[in-house]
Structures are given as structure tokens and as C-alpha cells.
């Protein structure tokens, strides 16, 4: 299991075409704070049918987009 597996599962189960989560929500779901390694781990999300659409440091949010 990867560092963010719980988050990827959450996004997949949600099933929305687009899902916006705050850094705090991601912390609650994944059990860890979002850090720079997220940029490397986000590639794993493709296996779950999603990709990271936008990371906003100003708003402290991440938008996940369904592939296809």
C-alpha cells in the first residue's frame, strides 16, 4: 500500500467527475498531512481512474478529475 492509498480509494469510491478536497480533508482521509512527496505519489492515482487536476496552495485545495 502506498502512502496515499486511503485517499486514492476515497476518490475512486466517490465516483464524481470532479472532486475538490481541502488539505485538511485530505489529512483526515489519508491520516497524513499533504507534503511535497504528494507530487510524486499522485501518479498512482491514474490506476484508480483519476488524475490530479489542480493543486491550489492559496486555497489549500486539490481538485481530482476522473479520467475518460
Model region roles, listed by residue range:
Residues 1-17, 32-68:
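Ser/Thr/Pro-rich, acidic low-complexity intrinsically disordered regulatory segments
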Residues 18-25:
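Short acidic, hydrophobic short linear motifs in intrinsically disordered regions
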Amino acid at each position: 500500500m502506498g502512502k496515499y492509498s486511503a485517499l486514492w480509494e476515497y476518490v475512486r469510491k466517490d465516483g464524481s467527475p470532479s472532486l475538490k478536497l481541502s488539505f485538511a480533508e485530505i489529512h483526515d482521509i489519508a491520516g497524513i498531512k499533504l507534503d511535497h512527496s504528494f507530487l510524486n505519489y499522485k501518479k498512482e492515482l491514474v490506476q484508480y481512474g483519476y488524475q490530479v487536476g489542480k493543486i491550489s496552495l492559496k486555497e489549500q485545495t486539490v481538485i481530482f478529475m476522473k479520467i475518460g
